[in-house]
């Protein structure tokens, strides 16, 4: 027995001595003095190295992902991946540290700067009679790699009008004989002769012949009741318009737009079958001007233009007009502001606090009359913004390549929304048993909807998941998916009947009121397929009744 113990101790001693004799070292199998990644998200390089001891790898840069991050002695392939696009003008660097038993070897990784076109301004206005204008920009592309073209035949680019040295595009706008303004986009694309990549765009708005100012404000703040609720508490929706002249109110244009907006809001399930729960109002807003370039409009709306679909407005003015309605509950109100413009844009704001610092359901959705009153894009974007974001507080389900992996700060922000019962259509786990829509994954009644766990949402490519490949909260071209329909249904019952619902209650309702799977193709030249939509904004400010 003593001999066995002595033998065991001898083996331990020899083993300990052997480990001490092995010094930590790294042997890199290729040149690492210059490790460069392309500017695109998910750009990757792999380096091979051998370590004589256990090792770990780390970096303090959020944009660089390392895999694997540790290992035992041996030869490894270390993948270095850019989690997001470098859309700045300058390259960026990260330090990767290989660590083993007190030894640290550092590697410098550089991500190249993206090709860019930077505009002096993103929106230009021109008068109805037409004329010339200059679009100024800077770029790091050579002349043969950059193409510039317009989406409208009324905007022409004379031969030899582009100045290479000065980065100026000279344009001519033909006269606009219509009363309404019209919009065109100028696209700046990188080309390799076969494919084009959109880098930036300019929005050009030409005024119509009816550009003037209002003189009669007598109908301002007039309230029109469009619908009284026949079920529940009567959830308030308030419609109002920005950029409408007194003459457009007098001739019935304003009321026509408000009526159409109301009908559009109830074109998708489940709100289509829950319409009786809503009180709907229209408040007349007389704007001094029908232009959004700094002239006075009732709500001071401005559109960012260019690559952005962002709309900003004066929410205090919107709230003032809401409170023209007698006995309305401001904190339960969905306000929809329709802009008197054909531009493709839309933005929603929520996260307003009451006097007790409690978050409320108040939301303000801004949406132009996209293209025209009967255009499908107007309906789709209005439903996406006002119903999806404004009423149900759903998240966006689309993603952009340049955004890469969702950062921890964004995850925290979305989880905060979920603590209020919002953002029920996205999650951060792939666990079928715990994901927010796990019940649908196990329900054979929803097999035809292909509900699953699809990576990419909240504008980010990875680290966040959505329920379906496409939906109203993705491309806007089809209805709400089942988890979103449930979120909307639950919201109506919670606020309209002061009660919680069960999964089975919803499925019974849902099957009795099936959602039509509408799919509409879009013109390839449409700006909607290439321009980023602004995410909803959590305002985080107090408002008082």
Q: Residue ranges of each PLM-predicted region?
A:
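Surface-exposed binding patches on compact interaction domains or structured appendages
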Residues: 34, 46-79, 141-170
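Propeptide-to-catalytic entry region of secreted or membrane-anchored zinc metalloproteases
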Residues: 210-327, 503-542
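Short pre-active-site segment immediately N-terminal to the catalytic Zn-binding motif
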Residues: 360-386
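Catalytic zinc-binding patch centered on the HExxH motif and its immediate surroundings
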Residues: 291-293, 320-330, 338-366
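Solvent-exposed, low-complexity, repeat-rich "mucin-like" stalks and linkers
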Residues: 19-22, 29-58, 120-147
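A short beta-strand micro-motif common to beta-rich folds, especially ectodomain repeats
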Residues: 80, 88-102, 169, 180-192
């Amino acid at each position: 027995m003593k001999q066995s113990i002595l033998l065991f101790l001898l083996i331990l001693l020899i083993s300990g001595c052997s480990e001490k004799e092995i010094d930590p070292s790294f042997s890199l199998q290729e040149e690492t003095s210059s490790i460069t990644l392309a500017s695109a998200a998910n750009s990757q390089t792999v380096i091979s190295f051998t370590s004589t001891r256990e090792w770990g790898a780390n970096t303090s840069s959020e944009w660089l992902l390392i895999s694997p991050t540790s290992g035992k002695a041996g030869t490894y392939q270390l993948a270095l991946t850019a989690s997001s696009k470098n859309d700045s003008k300058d390259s960026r660097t990260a330090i990767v540290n290989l660590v083993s038993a007190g030894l640290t070897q550092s590697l410098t990784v550089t991500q190249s700067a993206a090709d860019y076109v930077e505009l002096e301004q993103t929106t230009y206005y021109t008068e109805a009679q037409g004329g010339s204008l200059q679009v100024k920009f800077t770029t790091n592309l050579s002349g043969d790699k950059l193409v510039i073209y317009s989406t409208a035949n009324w905007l022409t680019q004379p031969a030899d009008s582009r100045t290479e040295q000065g980065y100026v595009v000279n344009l001519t706008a033909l006269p606009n004989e219509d009363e309404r303004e019209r919009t065109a986009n100028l696209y700046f694309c990188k080309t390799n002769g076969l494919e084009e990549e959109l880098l930036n765009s300019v929005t050009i708005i030409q005024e119509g012949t009816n550009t003037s100012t209002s003189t009669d404000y007598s109908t301002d703040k007039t309230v029109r009741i469009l619908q009284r609720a026949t079920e529940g508490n009567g959830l308030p929706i308030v419609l109002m318009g920005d950029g409408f002249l007194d003459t457009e109110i007098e001739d019935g244009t304003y009321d026509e737009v408000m009526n159409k907006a109301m009908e559009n809001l109830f074109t998708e399930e489940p709100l289509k079958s829950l319409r009786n729960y809503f009180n709907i109002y229209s408040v007349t807003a007389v704007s001094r001007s029908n232009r959004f370039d700094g002239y006075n409009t009732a709500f001071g709306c401005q559109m960012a233009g260019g690559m952005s679909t962002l709309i900003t407005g004066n929410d205090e003015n919107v709230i003032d007009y809401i409170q023209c309605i007698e006995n309305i509950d401001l904190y339960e109100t969905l306000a929809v502001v329709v802009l008197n413009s054909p531009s493709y844009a839309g933005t929603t704001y929520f996260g307003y606090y009451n006097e007790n610092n409690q978050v409320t359901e108040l939301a303000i959705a801004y949406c132009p009359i996209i293209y025209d009153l009967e255009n499908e894009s107007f309906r789709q974007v209005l439903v996406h913004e006002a119903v999806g974001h404004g009423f149900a507080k759903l998240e966006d389900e689309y993603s952009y390549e340049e955004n890469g992996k969702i950062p921890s700060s964004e995850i925290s922000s979305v989880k905060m929304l979920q603590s209020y019962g919002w953002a029920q259509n996205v999650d951060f786990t792939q666990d079928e048993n715990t994901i927010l829509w796990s019940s649908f994954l196990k329900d054979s009644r929803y097999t035809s909807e292909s509900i699953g766990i699809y990576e990419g949402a909240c504008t980010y490519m990875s680290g966040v998941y959505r329920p379906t490949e496409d939906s109203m909260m993705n491309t806007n071209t089809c209805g709400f998916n089942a988890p979103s329909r449930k979120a909307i249904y639950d919201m109506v019952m919670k606020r309209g009947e002061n009660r919680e619902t069960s999964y089975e209650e919803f499925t019974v309702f849902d099957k009795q009121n099936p959602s039509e799977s509408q799919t509409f193709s879009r013109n390839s030249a449409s700006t909607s397929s290439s321009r980023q939509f602004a995410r909803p904004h959590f305002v985080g400010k107090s408002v008082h009744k």
